[in-house]
Amino acid sequence: DTSTIRVGGRGAHLARPAEPTGAGMLLLPMITGIGQRVREFAAELAESGVTTLSWDPFHGVSMDDHELDTMVELMHGLDDETCLAEMQRLLDHMFGELGLEKVGVIGYCLGGRFALLLGARDERLANVVAYHPTVPATPADNHTVDPFEETPRIAAPVMMLYPGQDTIVPHEVFAKLQDGLQ
C-alpha cells in the first residue's frame, strides 16, 4: 500500500507493509527526488515488513519528469537546517501518528549525507544507513552543517558504504567520516 501523505505541510511518500511489524525506515533519496527508483526502494522495504516514509527534498519535483540540470539547481538550494527540521517532523510522524516502535534512517548519495547528519541529531533512531554519502572535499555553499563534526555524535549503529569508482567524493573524505564513526 503506497500513498502520498502530508506531514507538516509537505508531501512524503508512504509505503506500508501488508503485515506491519512496528518497524520503520525514513528513506532519504538521492538527487532524483522521489522518483520511480525511490518509490521502488520504499516498496521493497515495505514488502519486508518495514513501514517506509520517504522525505521529498524537492517538494514534488523528481527526475521522473525533470532533467538532471534542474535537479542539481534544486539541490544547491537546499538548506541543511531546514531539511533536518523536515526530517525530524517526519520522524515525529512515524513515532506518533504511525505508531512505529523502532525507526531507522537510510539515505543514498544526497540522502546519505543527510542520514549521517540526522543520525547525529536524533537519538530516537535505531540505525543509520548511508550509501555513498555525498560529502565533497570542499563543502558546497549551502552545506552549513559539518558532517565531520556531527558524525562522531551518532549513537545508533551505522552502516556506511563507499562506491569504489566515486568521482565526486574522494576516498580521503570517506576515510575521515569512517574515522569519526570509530
Over which residues does each language-model region extend?
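N-terminal cap/leader regions of alpha/beta-hydrolase-fold enzymes
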Residues: 1-182
